[in-house]
Amino acid sequence: MENIQKLIARYPLVEDLVALKETTWFNPGATSLAQGLPYVGLTEQDVNAAHDRLARFAPYLAKAFPQTAAAGGMIESDVVAIPAMQKRLEKEYGQTINGEMLLKKDSHLAISGSIKARGGIYEVLTHAEKLALEAGLLTTDDDYSVLLSPEFKQFFSQYSIAVGSTGNLGLSIGIMSACIGFKVTVHMSADARAWKKAKLRSHGVTVVEYEDDYGVAVEQGRKAAQSDPNCFFIDDENSRTLFLGYAVAGQRLKAQFAQQGRVVDASHPLFVYLPCGVGGGPGGVAFGLKLAFGDNVHCFFAEPTHSPCMLLGVYTGLHDAISVQDIGIDNLTAADGLAVGRASGFVGRAMERLLDGLYTLDDQTMYDMLGWLAQEEGIRLEPSALAGMAGPQRICAAAAYQQRHGFSQTQLGNATHLVWATGGGMVPEDEMEQYLAKGR
């Protein structure tokens, strides 16, 4: 307790985190892209290489997962306006939201129905490509749909993949690995939903369940993989490959906006609100967005009041040297995808200069907004995916933040507020009804 008091003396906002209050923190250390980019340790070239790799795999994905065929084997989601939800939020919170609210529907991505279809699938494909190239079975000029042949399945079956997950990452990696032919084990934390485990098992994935939280599942997965030289561990806490899989979203969103005739520049700022668990997904996406839109995009991470690991780590500068449990927070939240007690040190350090801020919200707030979105727009998401929905009213109410960035009322009126919906497209009907029943 004494240590917590010392921490609060240095970092007063910790008191609100400990009290589980909904908290907003605007990052005083935010810099321009030019200043912040060198600290990421990855470049635009790295993201372009990821983009090219996904293009090589497109013919394979189009055949392996027919639901991606219409998009030519690209796993990408729609961006839709949500005007009725915007009005509902203004009414419920008594706060005008200047500009236009949009929803990025990663919740409905093909194959695994969450943002994790970006990073998780990309890392599995990267590993498969590496093995096949090294074995001389493939060249980068080949049509990758050849990977569907029995010979390749046979080849990949001597290798295995392991990952620790609260659910969605395990789902995307499990489904993709099984399709390629890898043996795959997913180490699931206590928060993982039963339907996600059942779905994995139906794909022939081995699911190992833990009574503990995410950190333990990852640690056990890492240990199990170490004893097998043919086992590749996908490390959600430190993986640069996962991060790059998410980062590809930036250029793709830029292309979608261009198609829609939507302008992003100094006079038309873009605010993006990303739910954050360990940090890989939102970190990678935010990195890609910064590369695509530069200083005209402003990224915010959103976390549950019971799992504010990234806010705690970045705000104190302690990153992965502190966990929410260290300050007496239980890490128990209905937002199972965000139930992480210790943030990725890699992501926190890489992105701390490129984030405009982080905020927390209560589970009940997520349930309420889940219900409103279903009523107003007919879109159904899982609780975690609503974390970003609280962002626009916080930003529009933050006069000091607006002044610091010199936003005029005209600029704010021309703003786009993009809420990144991270999951929910595959939630079973009965489970969704339970979520909807909890909203007020």
From Swiss-Prot:
Q: Which GO terms describe its molecular function?
A: D-serine ammonia-lyase activity; hydro-lyase activity; pyridoxal phosphate binding
| An example Gene Ontology biological process | isoleucine biosynthetic process
* Modified sites of kind N6-(pyridoxal phosphate)lysine: K116
Q: Which reaction does it catalyse?
A: D-serine = pyruvate + NH4(+)
CC cofactor: pyridoxal 5'-phosphate
Write the record's keywords in alphabetical order, separated by commas.
Answer: Lyase, Pyridoxal phosphate
EC number(s) recorded for this UniProt protein: 4.3.1.18
**Which protein family is named in the record?**
Belongs to the serine/threonine dehydratase family. DsdA subfamily.
Quaternary structure, from the entry: Monomer.
What name goes with this protein?
D-serine dehydratase
Origin organism of this chain?
Salmonella dublin (strain CT_02021853)
Encoding gene per record? dsdA
